[in-house]
Every structure is written in structure tokens, then in C-alpha cells.
């Protein structure tokens, strides 16, 4: 558990932060601002408002909502079969669309029950993976990427690009609506895309087709931005600034360790 690990590190290595201060950070007031204890272990939180890039991207029509369907859940070995992405405007409307199917290198197997595309379907409508992947890299270059559980989608994309010697994704930033809704609505029974679509006033339901899923994700993103992220911006920055002195040292050390681990 990341929060438990963060507590242990803070108590051992951060002077001036006791149990009472940790409880303050984990209080409903902080939760309403979309903050978690683990945020303060990352130097980036003291360098810019956490959602500044997302809000700027929406203003500039530079947010792309993104989802993939694949042959399985192993990001290192499974193949993407569908990429759906939509550049959106501030209200969540479509600015530009990207939807392509890929001929996978392996059978879809049991994943067909999830996305409903058979090997025969993909043999007919799928394209060469290298062509589609390269086109998506260009489509998404320097954009803010948003998805639901987007770490999976980014991870399998990164693996596919490496497999075809196409470099790495060229995103300006990445935001996860799964993480965002967990922060602002921690008491929901779960944070699956279907549950969120039924809970909040949006008019599109996900179906495990990547295109349907990004339409739902785009509407949920706009909802949480207007209802939660923007209204709590001042409170969030006040809380971050109040803890900067105590946490900037350990955050800097943790950021250095992360950089070394990524080399």
C-alpha cells in the first residue's frame, strides 16, 4: 500500500511531521481538494499546480482522450488491436478523431469476450501495426493524454512502440480519470468506468469498445474538472504551500531515486 509506505518513510526520515500532521493531510478537507499523502513525496507537486497542465490543455484544445483494446492484459507480450483517441474542446466535444484497428501478431483468444472482435474481424479490418502506431505517435505528439486506468494503455503502447523500433510516446502529460475520481469520490463502491457513467450525469455509457469508452471518459473528465478540480484549486494550492517546507527535502530525495531507477 503506497499510503502505508509513505507514512513509514515520513515518520522515519522527515522531521517535524508527526501523526497529527499526517492525519491533517489525510483529512476530508485535503481529500476534497484532491490530495493524497503520497503526493507530497513527489517534487513535482511543489513546482506547479497538479492540474495546471490539464486545464491549460483544455483551454487550448490540446487534450486527447485515449483508450486501447488488446489481446490481453500483459502489457509486455499482448498486442493492441484497436486505438481510439479524440482531441476534445473545453466542453468535451470532438475536435479531431483517431480510430484504427490493428492486425495482431497473436490470436485474440479469450479477450474476444471482452471487446467482441474476432481474429477474422481483425484480419479484415486491421492494418499493419507499425503504420497505425506511427500515425498515433504523430496524432498525439505534445498533447495532454487522458484515459481511464490510463497507465495500462500507456504501458502497452510503450511496449508496442519499442517492439517496432518506433521510440517512445511523445506526450506532454498524462492524467488518469480513475485516479482523479478515486481522489474526489473515495466512498463510491468502485470506480469502474461503467459505475461512474451510471453515477454521474453523463449521457454516454462505456461498452468495452475503445471508442465508446473514450466518449464516456471525455464527459466524465469535463464533469470532474468543472465540479471538483476548478472549484478546489485555491484550497489545493494553499495546502501544498503549507506543507512545502516540511516535505520538499524528502520529495527531492525521492525524485532523485526515481530518476536513478528509470535509467
Enumerate the predicted regions with their spans.
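A short, structured active-site edge motif that brings together acidic residues
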Residues: 171-181
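Conserved non-catalytic scaffold segment of RNase H-like nuclease domains
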Residues: 59-172, 186-208
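Short, glycine/acidic-enriched loop or turn micro-motifs at the edges of active sites
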Residues: 70-72, 179, 216
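Helix-hairpin-helix
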Residues: 2-31
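Short, motif-level signal for alpha-helix interfacial/capping segments enriched in acidic residues
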Residues: 1-4, 41-54, 153-155, 189-193
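Acidic, Mg2+-coordinating catalytic module of metal-dependent nucleases/exonucleases
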Residues: 6-8, 19-22, 141-151, 156-161, ...
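Acidic two-metal-ion nuclease catalytic site recognized across multiple nuclease folds
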Residues: 30-61, 222-263
Amino acid at each position: 500500500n503506497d499510503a502505508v509506505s509513505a507514512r513509514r518513510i515520513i515518520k522515519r526520515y522527515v522531521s517535524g511531521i508527526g501523526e497529527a500532521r499526517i492525519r491533517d493531510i489525510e483529512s476530508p478537507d485535503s481529500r476534497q481538494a484532491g490530495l493524497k499523502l503520497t503526493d507530497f513525496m513527489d517534487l513535482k507537486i511543489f513546482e506547479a499546480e497538479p492540474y495546471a497542465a490539464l486545464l491549460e490543455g483544455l483551454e487550448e484544445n490540446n487534450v486527447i482522450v485515449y483508450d486501447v483494446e488488446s489481446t490481453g492484459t500483459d502489457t509486455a507480450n499482448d498486442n493492441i488491436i484497436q486505438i481510439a483517441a479524440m482531441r476534445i474542446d473545453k466542453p468535451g466535444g470532438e475536435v479531431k478523431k483517431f480510430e484504427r484497428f490493428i492486425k495482431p501478431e497473436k490470436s485474440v483468444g479469450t479477450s474476444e469476450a471482452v471487446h467482441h472482435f474476432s481474429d477474422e474481424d481483425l484480419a479484415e479490418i486491421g492494418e499493419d501495426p507499425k503504420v497505425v502506431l506511427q500515425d498515433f505517435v504523430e496524432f498525439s505528439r505534445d498533447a495532454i493524454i487522458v484515459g481511464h486506468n490510463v497507465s495500462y494503455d500507456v504501458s502497452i503502447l510503450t511496449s508496442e512502440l519499442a517492439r517496432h523500433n518506433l521510440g517512445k510516446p511523445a506526450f506532454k502529460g498524462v492524467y488518469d480519470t480513475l485516479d482523479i475520481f478515486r481522489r474526489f469520490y473515495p466512498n463510491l463502491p468502485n470506480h469502474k468506468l461503467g459505475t461512474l457513467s451510471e453515477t454521474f450525469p453523463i449521457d454516454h455509457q462505456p461498452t468495452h469498445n475503445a471508442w465508446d469508452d473514450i466518449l464516456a471518459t471525455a464527459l466524465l473528465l469535463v464533469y470532474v474538472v468543472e465540479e471538483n478540480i476548478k472549484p478546489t484549486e485555491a484550497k489545493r494550492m494553499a495546502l501544498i504551500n503549507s506543507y512545502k517546507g516540511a516535505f520538499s527535502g524528502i520529495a527531492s530525495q525521492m525524485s532523485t531515486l526515481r530518476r536513478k531507477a528509470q535509467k
